[in-house]
């Protein structure tokens, strides 16, 4: 199995780095003239996939908006994942899971094992229980050539109380965010051209003293409508091995499939120029 | 709507504090002579619910073990939740979700809105994005009389690197775990007899300097087979307003419905004596 980092590196070279978030919240369904129900969810999500999945390297469905509708919403998510992959996009499922032991293993089985109905190329994970609590997910990712994006340094205003906290016993008084990047640097040390273990770092954090050279990809939410510019991405993430600027609203509000497609193709061109 | 804290207080008085985790991992399904598939999951989970939900105050299904089977596993989870509540147990769904803004709201809708197929009495949440990132979930819980259990001080060996990290600007150099307890103390300040906003604190942490008097319930995993004793629970959590010692393996390995029922009734008697 080709590692996720290698597949992502090739996909970015082929299609560009833009990651499109599929975030079917109630307001968007309403803007599209759809009901806030499973039928509306399905129409919305599959139309977006059909319009953009053949043109972008990474599609990022937000699981929460499917979980809202219980098992029937998850059945739609299964189709979103399968159809996105069939169209040649890598699927980064945004689930922010994290637990310990056999429960972490169960999440790995759910989202990274190719035999699962929700099998994705990569997922987001949350390290509040310590980075090592994610070990079963890391090992499963290695086995199946999948990737992870670990929450590290997000741009929401409430994040610093945890992510900037100082870790005992680290030289220089490192932060929680810095420690997560250190763990990722270790996991990616031998990888070439790109590691499979990424970090979530907000595109609108302004600036950071953290070392983003960890040989893995950065998922950078907040690009576009939420304020992050191409200049921000270049300035903030110059040291990173690869960056996926992630945008959702900018694309989804366009509604018309041709306009959505043109927008993602043009944005990828701008990001690569 | 009666607040979750009040409902939990009454349920503990009526049935005792034991929380039974429903953790149908592959090994347990095999021990029960069941297949590692949706049919095995359903048989296992519904037999456990039928045996113990009429006798315990809180049933805690672990979502990961249902997510493993995609939408069909989630359909089983919907039945587990509904049948547990119909039997008079409160359902604490262990999902450890956490996100920001409209995504946090979507998780709240998924698990705390009574119209959702997965509506539960309470859920576990993860504060890596900062406690305030959970605000939409807190507000939705208040609206619907639901509860939350926020990860704070877990007993897994990897937890301290995040949970013991020192928060800048807090007098005395408070920890991340302590800050989470402070946030909970604020949310529960006016509640009587018990707040609705709880913490997850491992039954096997040994000792702690954190102040557990935050007027909310403590979920204490690790009780029983994982090593936590009744003496540990009394010593560690003497200051807490209410404690839910949580056990899974001890109960589930018994298999026979009558034996499971007798075990949970006897354990509740011991915990109350």
Swiss-Prot record, chains A, B:
Catalytic activity as recorded in UniProt = orotidine 5'-phosphate + H(+) = UMP + CO2
Name the InterPro entries on file.
Answer: Aldolase_TIM, OMPdecase_type-2, OMPdeCOase_dom, RibuloseP-bd_barrel
Q: What SMART domains does its record include?
A: OMPdecase (SM00934)
What Enzyme Commission number(s) does the record list for this chain? 4.1.1.23
* Example GO molecular function: orotidine-5'-phosphate decarboxylase activity
| Family recorded in the similarity comment | Belongs to the OMP decarboxylase family. Type 2 subfamily.
Question: Protein name, please?
Answer: Orotidine 5'-phosphate decarboxylase
Q: What is the lineage of its organism?
A: Bacteria, Bacillati, Actinomycetota, Actinomycetes, Propionibacteriales
């Amino acid at each position: 199995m080709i590692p996720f980092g290698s597949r992502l590196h090739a996909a970015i070279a082929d299609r560009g780095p833009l990651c499109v978030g599929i975030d079917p919240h109630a307001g968007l369904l309403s803007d599209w003239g759809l009901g806030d129900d499973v039928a509306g969810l399905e129409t919305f999500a599959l139309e977006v996939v059909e319009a953009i999945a053949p043109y972008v390297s990474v599609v990022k469905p937000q699981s929460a908006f499917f979980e809202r509708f219980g098992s029937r919403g998850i059945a739609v998510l299964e189709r979103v994942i399968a159809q996105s992959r069939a169209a040649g996009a890598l699927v980064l499922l945004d689930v922010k899971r994290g637990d310990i032991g056999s429960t972490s293993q169960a999440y790995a089985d759910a989202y990274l094992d190719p035999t699962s109905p929700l099998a994705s190329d990569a997922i987001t994970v949350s390290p509040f229980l310590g980075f090592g609590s994610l070990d079963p997910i890391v090992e499963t990712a290695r086995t199946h050539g999948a990737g992870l994006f670990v929450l590290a340094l997000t741009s929401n205003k409430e994040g610093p109380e945890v992510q900037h906290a100082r870790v005992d016993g680290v030289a220089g008084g490192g932060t929680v965010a810095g420690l997560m990047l250190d763990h990722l640097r270790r996991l990616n040390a031998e990888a070439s051209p790109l590691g499979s273990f990424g970090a979530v770092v907000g595109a609108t954090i302004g600036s950071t003293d953290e070392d983003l050279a960890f040989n893995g990809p950065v998922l950078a939410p907040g690009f576009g409508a939420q304020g992050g510019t191409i200049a921000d991405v270049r300035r903030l993430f110059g040291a990173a091995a690869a960056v996926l600027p992630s945008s959702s609203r900018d694309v989804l509000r366009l509604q018309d499939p041709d306009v959505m497609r043109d927008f993602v193709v043009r944005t990828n061109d701008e990001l690569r120029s």
